Structure formats: structure tokens, C-alpha cells
Amino acid sequence: MKDNGAELTATVHYLLFYEVVDGYAEKRAPFREQHLKYARQAFERGELVLAGALAEPLDGAVLVFRGPTPHFAEAFAKGDPYVINGLIKSWRVRKCMTVIPSEQS
């Protein structure tokens, strides 16, 4: 990847986008602890970099995964208590070429 002729080093991340159901804030309560535990485990394994809900309106979430393939993000979604219990209308994974910060900085 080049920026004004200079070589940039990119780190591959995968973004997991969730679209949540109407009434998500209320409906998630019974599954929230399970979901957070599941996310913490992925973080502790070094797969999940950061995660959070999209606010105003609360209509989705974004989770950032590291790795050479979308495997960790896809596997996370398939096993997430929010997905399993119908709180997520849809999810998708997109590759992101991160240049700032780079892992070399």
C-alpha cells in the first residue's frame, strides 16, 4: 500500500457488523452476561481487539478482530449468545487494511 509514494505497512483486521432487532436494549438483558463473557474470552485469546454498540440510534454493533482470515470473526458471530438467541437481525464481516496505528509503530 502506498501513500504519496511512501510505502505503508497495513495490518489486516476483520470488522464484524451486527444489525440488532427492535427493542434490543431491553431484550439483551437475559443474555448480556453470557455475551460479555464470550467476548472477553475472545479478547483474552488475542482474537478480539475491541467491540462496542453503535449509539444514537442503538441499531448495531461493531467488533474488530485480528487475524489473517475472517475465521475468528465468523466463528465468533456463529457462537455469540446474542446471535443464537435472535437479538441480531443480520451480521457481516468486512476486511479492513489498518495503516494507523501499524503494528510496527
Task: Name these PLM-found stretches.
Residues M1-S105:
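Conserved, structured core segments of small domains
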